[in-house]
UniProtKB/Swiss-Prot annotation:
Listed InterPro entries: DNA-dir_RNA_pol_omega, Pol_omega/Rpo6/RPB6, RPB6/omega-like_sf
Gene Ontology CC: one annotated term: DNA-directed RNA polymerase complex
Disulfide bond annotation, renumbered to this chain: none
Keyword Nucleotidyltransferase set for record: yes
Family per similarity comment: Belongs to the RNA polymerase subunit omega family.
The protein, known as: DNA-directed RNA polymerase subunit omega
Keyword Magnesium applies: no
Job of this protein: Promotes RNA polymerase assembly. Latches the N- and C-terminal regions of the beta' subunit thereby facilitating its interaction with the beta and alpha subunits.
Species name: Anaeromyxobacter sp. (strain Fw109-5)
Upper lineage: Bacteria, Pseudomonadati, Myxococcota, Myxococcia, Myxococcales
Entry EC number(s): 2.7.7.6
Keywords (A to Z) from UniProt: DNA-directed RNA polymerase, Nucleotidyltransferase, Transcription, Transferase
């Protein structure tokens, strides 16, 4: 695999948003010193993470819906009661 694309990973991950979360988490693990599951020492951590996802070596350990809803619940809990947050 000369180049990794989102399309290479989508058959193994439900949607693009979940793919971003998974790739980000794995990239952070690699940058913190985790060993790559594939031998790509020359590539940067995000490329290694996407290659691992595309080959099925990295995946969510729970459903994507649970992972995403947990992320949103965490964000909601940081907003004080009665207030809203507007993104611009």
């Amino acid at each position: 695999m000369a180049r990794v694309t989102v399309e290479d990973c989508l058959p193994l991950v439900d949607n693009r948003f979940a793919l971003v979360l998974l790739a980000t988490k794995r990239t952070r693990q690699l940058m913190a010193g985790a060993r790559p599951l594939q031998g790509h020492a020359k590539n940067k951590a995000p490329v290694v993470a996407l290659r691992e996802i595309a080959t099925g070596k990295v995946r969510f350990d729970r459903s994507v819906r649970d992972a995403l809803s947990g992320k949103f619940d965490k964000e909601k809990s940081t907003i004080p009661a009665g207030q809203t947050r507007t993104l611009r």
